[in-house]
From Swiss-Prot:
Gene3D superfamilies registered for this protein in UniProt: Single-stranded right-handed beta-helix, Pectin lyase-like
Subcellular location: Periplasm
Identification of the protein by name: Probable ABC transporter binding protein NosD
GO CC term (a single one): periplasmic space
Gene giving rise to this polypeptide: nosD
Phylogenetic lineage: Bacteria, Pseudomonadati, Pseudomonadota, Gammaproteobacteria, Pseudomonadales
Chief location: periplasm
Signal sequence segment: 1-27
Organism of derivation: Stutzerimonas stutzeri
Pfam families attached to this UniProt entry: NosD (PF05048)
Length: 436
């Protein structure tokens, strides 16, 4: 019925090495043709209801649709489905208990380099390893899947919900990922589109590494240890995303350049446990953290009710920051550098809920600049023990001296045109995804 096709990839290499050196007696995957498939047209097949045990390969183009009640149970070994042919569709299947060996990249669905244009749609997956692993191919679609990791396993020992490696042209849309390591991990993959995904109770909600010209639109993260971890990438478009009740960081930018961060909503980011993850340091509950990132546009975002609104450090300069709202954060800004940063563009600044200035000419802009940090703030950052003197007369004298003699003023953030009205009300009223 089907013709076999030989394929070699990182996956097959990893499995071969494991079997060679460990002497493992893992059963070899079987062809999908060993299942009682029912024809449904040319290259179209249906899998009837029932529980099917094992791991299965798809080696020729086909459309596989599972009827309600069709379950593939992999008994804690290997990958449930291994796809090595182009133009394969897998839809409506339930995949349980695949393997947990992250070195072998055990996955519910593993897509090999030859499997261009694969479509993985509306499936349910629950297991300890990776959910959907896409390895070195292009134009894959991962749409409408429910992926649930094993909450009983340490976060570091789980697989990612959706993992893209060396992938281009992928569309990852409207998936729901829970209890994985990272929700969606994009590694060395350019030109991909993520939209409408909901990610909860993971380490990083969305994690980019060395991934350029990707778009991240209208996604939601909740209760993660970092909502959106953007690292070592350029020309990202990050628009309309929400971070709700995440810990440590809402949006983290690490070596990000020439990217656009607009229309995002971040709320209730608080200090949290990093879970032993050495990649996360500090964890002060920052709505937006910008580290060594330059030439980015950060506009029309809403950052609220977090321990720290925005923190810039390590040479994060020459970014366009305007039209954002910083509302009710315990501390609005943390910035330590050697030169002053102007946070307004073309006469339009940002909204600051703690701004105490006035607008006498009713042009919607404050008449005096907003300057969130002064020499005393810098002193407190460098020497935290000084906080014991926070309300003492000596601190008040220092603040009075720097106001009276601005010549000793140190570099910091200045918003010369602060907004008097909240510019992000639309983000507050947009319909939210229901909480699970």
């Amino acid at each position: 019925m089907f013709k076999a096709q030989a394929t070699f990839s990182r996956y097959s290499a990893a499995v071969s090495l494991l079997l060679l050196f460990s002497g493992a007696a893992q059963a070899a995957p079987q062809s999908i043709t060993t299942l009682p498939l029912q024809p449904d047209g040319e290259n179209r097949w249906r899998l009837p209801a029932g529980e099917y045990q094992g791991q299965f390969t798809i080696e020729q183009p086909m459309q596989l649709r599972c009827e309600p009640g069709a379950v593939i149970q992999s008994q804690g070994q290997g990958s449930s489905l291994l796809i090595s042919a182009p133009d394969v569709l897998v839809e409506g299947c339930t995949l349980y208990e695949w393997g947990s060996d992250l070195t072998a990249m055990d996955s519910a669905v593993f897509i090999l380099p030859a499997a261009e244009r694969a479509q993985i749609s509306n499936n349910r997956m629950r297991g300890p390893g990776f959910g959907v692993f896409v390895d070195g191919t292009r134009d894959v679609q991962v749409i409408g899947n429910e992926i649930d990791g094993d909450a009983g396993v340490r976060s570091q020992d789980r697989g990612n919900g959706i993992h893209l490696f060396a992938v281009s042209g992928a569309r990852v849309l409207h998936n729901h990922v829970r209890n994985a390591r990272d929700g969606i991990y994009i590694d060395t993959s350019n030109g991909n589109h993520l939209e409408g995904n909901v990610i909860e109770d993971v380490r990083y909600g969305v994690h980019y590494m060395f991934a350029n010209e990707n778009s991240l639109i209208d996604n939601v993260t909740r209760r993660t240890r970092t909502g959106y971890a953007l690292m070592q990438s350029r020309k990202l478009t990050v628009t309309g995303n929400r971070s709700e009740q995440d810990q440590n960081y809402g949006i983290l930018m690490n070596y990000i350049t020439y990217s656009t961060i607009t229309g995002n909503f971040v709320s209730d980011v608080q200090r949290g446990d990093t879970g032993g993850d050495s990649m996360i340091s500090g964890g002060e509950g920052k709505a937006l953290f910008i580290y060594n990132s330059l030439f980015n546009t950060i506009e029309n975002n809403h950052f609220e009710k977090s321990s720290l609104g925005i923190h810039l450090t390590a040479g994060s300069e020459d970014n366009r920051i305007s039209g954002n709202a910083f509302v009710g954060n315990q501390q609005q800004v943390k910035y330590v550098a050697s030169r002053t940063q102007e946070w307004s563009v073309d006469g339009r600044g940002n909204y600051w809920s703690d701004y105490l200035g006035w607008d006498r000419n009713n042009d919607g802009l404050g008449d005096i600049a907003y300057e969130p940090n002064d020499n005393v703030d810098r002193l407190l950052w460098l020497y935290p023990q000084v906080r014991l003197l926070m309300n003492s007369p000596s601190i008040e004298v220092l603040r009075w001296v720097q106001r009276a003699f601005p010549v000793i003023k140190s570099p910091g953030v200045q918003d010369s045109h602060p907004l008097m009205k909240l510019p992000t009300e639309k983000l507050l009223t947009e319909k939210q995804e229901p909480t699970s």
